[in-house]
Design a protein with these regions (language model features):
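Conserved HGGG/HGGXW glycine-rich cap/lid loop of the alpha/beta-hydrolase fold
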Residues: 6-60
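Acidic beta-to-alpha connecting loop that harbors the catalytic carboxylate
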Residues: 17, 212-214, 239-241
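Structural signature of beta-strand start/N-cap positions in the alpha/beta core
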Residues: 20, 44-46, 81-84, 105-108, ...
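Active-site loop/oxyanion-hole signature of alpha/beta-hydrolase fold enzymes
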Residues: 35-42, 48-90, 254-257
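Flexible "cap/lid" loop of the alpha/beta hydrolase fold
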Residues: 97-101, 107-138
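Conserved alpha/beta-hydrolase catalytic His-Asp/Glu region
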Residues: 123-124, 138-193, 198
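Conserved serine/cysteine hydrolase catalytic core
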Residues: 173-227, 236
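Catalytic active-site module of serine/aspartate enzymes centered on a nucleophile-bearing elbow/loop
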Residues: 231-263
Length: 263
């Protein structure tokens, strides 16, 4: 399905019925990363999975844009209010920003290996990003994709190739699409001031999910969320890196469904 939002054609998938749950993908992925969640969640919820602008099958016009405004536009177009937001990495950062700007539209938050705007924990671990930065500097998109797959899918403390097929091919295909998008021609506007110093304003019940093999910067961000968001709870998925919903879908589904279905 497609809809025009703020001058861009945005692709999304929708299934099930009930209270709406919007899944926001990571920056190395697209809506397909949530495929292992669709059957379990759509039995009880209206499941919406957009490809964000420049990812998957959504276009990226060469104009300024705002991820928060795109999400708001999608929710308005689909008449969704309020919703549960589930976001991974970049999608988690968007969920946080959206919850700060539009608290009345968010019922519950699930933040998976989440980013938070205004943090820079990654700069503390430059050695982990050396291979990625070298491939990026060389302009070798295939090498960059492979390096990012090891960093984000395998995780920095597990051997290269630890995560098996078909997840490796899925990662490479999802990430390749965004690597070929020209984000330099479409500058994005972000929350100002950023979320890092405003996390105490979040009022939605919040579940912070991390894989124990994720990057240390992601662990630092999870610690910040736990310290700053009132009542936040943490769930650690063992033997999982940055995309725990793909590595251990049954455990992830159980944890998140239990949280969303609380009364």
């Amino acid at each position: 399905m497609e809809v025009s939002i703020n001058g861009a054609r945005i692709h999304y998938e929708r299934s099930g019925s009930g209270f709406p749950v919007v899944f926001l993908h990571a920056g190395v992925a697209d809506a397909r990363m949530w495929e292992p969640q669709v059957a379990a969640f759509s039995r009880q919820f209206d499941v919406i999975r957009p490809d964000m602008r420049g990812f998957g099958d959504s276009e990226l016009p060469p104009t300024p844009w705002s991820p928060v405004e795109d999400l708001l536009g999608l929710m308005d177009e689909l008449e969704l209010k309020p919703v549960h937001l589930i976001g991974c990495s970049m999608g988690g950062g968007l969920a946080v920003d959206f919850a700060l700007d539009h608290a009345e539209r968010v019922s519950r938050l699930v933040l998976v290996g989440s980013g938070v705007s205004g943090t820079d924990f990654g700069s503390k671990y430059p050695e982990l990003h050396a291979e990625v930065e070298a491939a990026d500097k060389a302009g070798d998109l295939d090498a960059l994709n492979q390096a990012e797959m090891h960093l984000w899918l395998d995780g920095p403390r597990r051997p290269r190739g630890y995560v098996k097929q078909p997840l490796r091919d899925l990662f490479l295909d999802m990430n390749a699409r965004s690597l070929h998008s020209d984000f330099d021609s479409a500058p994005s506007r972000h929350l100002d001031p950023p979320a890092a110093k405003r996390l105490h304003e979040i009022t939605a019940p919040t579940l912070v999910v991390v894989g124990d093999q994720d990057l240390p910067a992601i662990m630092n961000t999870a610690d910040l969320l736990m310290k700053s968001v009132a009542g936040a709870r943490r769930a650690v998925i063992h033997d999982a890196a940055h995309l725990p919903n793909l590595e251990h879908p049954e455990e992830f589904n159980r944890l998140v469904l239990d949280f969303l279905l609380e009364t």
